[in-house]
């Protein structure tokens, strides 16, 4: 395909136009008085949202240079959303301000590389101040306040705080659509996976159709079991210990399954057999997780362990196991705390190194099952449009609350950046164009507060000047128009959100400023219509039939 190339100022201005179109659409949503944006969908009802990344994803531009500029800013929003779950609009507003101020200096003859270095040093200094001023979250109320701001709903904030309190910061909180109106929280105790008993004969509670084993041994096998001879040695040892047995294997069939069922019916031996969760490498990993959690080992020929010779020392233990027809829950596995911690850190590093969203999600689920627990928030609404929007808000608020627990909180409302900047720039000693680069950051960090004030119908410059003179942590409550102690009023942002927004915006701004040429696909001319007369022009696309 033919390419078109733009150089120098033309290239940079083309990118900036794309950035501005996207940023102008996104920034109207910033702050408590921000507006919504309606997104048309090819199929189904339109989506109404005030989420920056959702709006950014929908914007496609015709001009090839503008399109590239918009795509670069989408990356800022997406990366901030992935890392922190919020701050996408703040990141976009910061990127726009940095690029605008930066290009003005490049056009005036400043060296782009020196500007970039100055921007990086200033951002590093501001980030250090943000982290130093962060306040650790200690109470459920503080988590609720943070989540409420992200979701724009106090009830959602309280529910997320409750969920985080129960599952811990490593736990997984998933959001599902509900057929009923309102919100509901469902908690899972212990490790749960989506495989139930192989046969209903294993049921111990006929009314609830579930098998409950107290203080059982757990046999974990990475292969099929069909021959009863393989099981005999283990079964005898477990029977002598007078404890029940949970068997997790690729499959259990034939006489091996029949023997377990007969012994259960006769009442001589209580056991339950379930299939291992997952497939392929994911199954191996999940079995290893279960083994570490319960203090057992995966019996597999790959590691030289055979079922026929397995002793009790290879079996896991738990306080309780509950098995239904669809899922198995292991409560309080007897695994070694250090080994579990090691496994958790291994999974965490896999999450950081993974490029796939799907893999990351699955790894996060495994991490939660080992380190915390799983909570499900079920959300309902009157219409499909409202339900989609509500579900998305809750998902963002969950990530926001987790970010707050992780690194702490700072004053919200765009104030933390301005106040951290005041301290950072007082100690920053730079010269020449690097100092100019730092000044670009000094100007740009006012942008989020200015936009919040503008969206609230206030004069941005006046608000920023007023905030500069206030004590640390004090600023504008845009919802009421009053100047208050923001942290005390529950108006806060996770420092991870503010930090990520600034760092990601600066990263893209540096790319804009140091761009000297843009190569884009040449737009194709529209193919001529294939219809006949004027009145049939709309049928041109039917020519292929």
Swiss-Prot record:
A Gene Ontology biological process annotation? protein refolding
GO CC, sorted alphabetically, is:
cytoplasm
Q: Using the UniProt record, name the top-level EC class of this enzyme in a single word.
A: isomerase
Q: Where does this protein hold ATP?
A: 29-32, 86-90, 413, 477-479, 493
Which SUPFAM superfamilies does the UniProt entry name for this protein? GroEL apical domain-like, GroEL equatorial domain-like, GroEL-intermediate domain like
Q: Known EC number(s)? A: 5.6.1.7
Output the CDD domains linked to this UniProt entry: GroEL
Q: Which reaction does it catalyse?
A: ATP + H2O + a folded polypeptide = ADP + phosphate + an unfolded polypeptide
Under the heading InterPro entries, the entry gives: Chaperonin_Cpn60_CS, Cpn60/GroEL, Cpn60/GroEL/TCP-1, GroEL-like_apical_dom_sf, GROEL-like_equatorial_sf, TCP-1-like_intermed_sf
Recall the GO molecular function terms of this protein's record. ATP binding; ATP-dependent protein folding chaperone; isomerase activity; unfolded protein binding
- Principal location class: cytoplasm
Which Pfam family, any one, appears in the UniProt record? Cpn60_TCP1
Show the Gene3D superfamilies listed in the entry: GroEL (3.50.7.10), GroEL-like equatorial domain (1.10.560.10), TCP-1-like chaperonin intermediate domain (3.30.260.10)
Q: Does the keyword Cytoplasm apply?
A: yes
Quote the subcellular location field of this record.
Answer: Cytoplasm
Please provide the record's keywords in A-Z order: ATP-binding, Chaperone, Cytoplasm, Isomerase, Nucleotide-binding
> Which NCBIfam families would you find in this protein's record?
GroEL, PRK00013.1, PRK12849.1, PRK12850.1, PRK12851.1
User: What is said about its interaction partners and assembly?
Assistant: Forms a cylinder of 14 subunits composed of two heptameric rings stacked back-to-back. Interacts with the co-chaperonin GroES.
Family named by the database record: Belongs to the chaperonin (HSP60) family.
Q: What does this protein do?
A: Together with its co-chaperonin GroES, plays an essential role in assisting protein folding. The GroEL-GroES system forms a nano-cage that allows encapsulation of the non-native substrate proteins and provides a physical environment optimized to promote and accelerate protein folding.
Protein name listed in UniProt: Chaperonin GroEL 1
Task: List the source organism.
Answer: Arthrobacter sp. (strain FB24)
The encoding gene is: groEL1
């Amino acid at each position: 395909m033919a390419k078109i190339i733009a150089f120098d100022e033309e290239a940079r201005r083309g990118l900036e136009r794309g950035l501005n179109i996207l940023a102008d659409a996104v920034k109207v949503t910033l702050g408590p008085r921000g507006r919504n944006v309606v997104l048309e969908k090819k199929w189904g009802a339109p989506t109404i949202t005030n989420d920056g990344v959702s709006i950014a994803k929908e914007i496609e531009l015709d001009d090839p240079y503008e399109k590239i500029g918009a795509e670069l800013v989408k990356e800022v929003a997406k990366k901030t959303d992935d890392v922190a779950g919020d701050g996408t609009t703040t990141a976009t507003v910061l990127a726009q301000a940095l690029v605008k101020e930066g290009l003005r200096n490049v056009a005036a003859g400043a060296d782009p590389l020196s500007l970039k270095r100055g921007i990086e040093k200033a951002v590093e200094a501001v980030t250090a101040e943000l982290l130093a001023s962060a306040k650790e979250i200690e109470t459920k109320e503080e988590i609720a306040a943070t989540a409420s701001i992200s979701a724009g709903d106090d009830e959602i904030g309280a529910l997320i705080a409750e969920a985080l309190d129960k599952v811990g910061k490593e736990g997984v909180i998933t959001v599902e659509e509900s057929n009923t109106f309102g919100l509901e929280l469902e908690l899972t105790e212990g490790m749960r996976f989506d495989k139930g008993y192989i046969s209903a004969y294993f049921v111990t509670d006929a009314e609830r159709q579930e098998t409950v084993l107290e203080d059982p041994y757990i046999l974990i096998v990475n292969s099929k079991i069909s021959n009863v001879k393989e099981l005999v040695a283990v079964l005898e040892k477990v029977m002598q210990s007078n404890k029940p047995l949970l068997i997790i294997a690729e499959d259990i069939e034939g006489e091996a399954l029949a023997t377990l069922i007969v012994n259960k019916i006769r009442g001589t031996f209580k056991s339950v057999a379930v299939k291992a969760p997952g497939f392929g490498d994911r199954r191996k990993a999940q079995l290893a997780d279960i083994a570490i959690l319960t203090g057992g080992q995966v019996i597999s020929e790959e590691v030289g362990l055979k079922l026929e010779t397995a002793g009790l020392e290879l079996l896991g233990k738990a306080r309780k196991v509950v098995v239904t027809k669809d899922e198995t829950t292991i409560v309080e596995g007897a695994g070694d705390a250090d080994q579990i911690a090691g496994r958790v850190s291994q999974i965490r590093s896999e999450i950081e190194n993974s490029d796939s969203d799907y893999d990351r999600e699955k790894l996060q689920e495994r991490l939660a099952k080992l380190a915390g627990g799983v909570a499900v928030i079920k959300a309902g609404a009157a219409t499909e449009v409202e339900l989609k929007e509500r579900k998305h808000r809750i998902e963002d608020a969950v990530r926001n609350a987790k970010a707050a627990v992780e690194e702490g909180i700072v004053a919200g409302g765009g104030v933390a950046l301005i106040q951290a900047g005041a301290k950072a720039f007082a100690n920053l000693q730079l010269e020449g164009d690097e100092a100019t680069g730092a000044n670009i950051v000094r100007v740009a960090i006012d942008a989020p507060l200015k936009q919040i004030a503008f969206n609230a119908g206030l004069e941005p410059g006046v608000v920023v000047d007023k905030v500069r003179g206030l004590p640390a942590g004090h600023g504008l409550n845009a919802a009421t128009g009053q100047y208050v102690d923001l942290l005390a009023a529950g108006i806060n942002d996770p420092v991870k959100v503010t930090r990520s927004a600034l760092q990601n915006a600066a990263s893209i701004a540096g790319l804009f400023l140091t761009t000297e040429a843009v190569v884009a696909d040449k737009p194709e001319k529209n193919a001529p219509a294939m219809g006949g007369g004027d009145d049939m022009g709309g049928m041109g696309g039917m020519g292929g039939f």
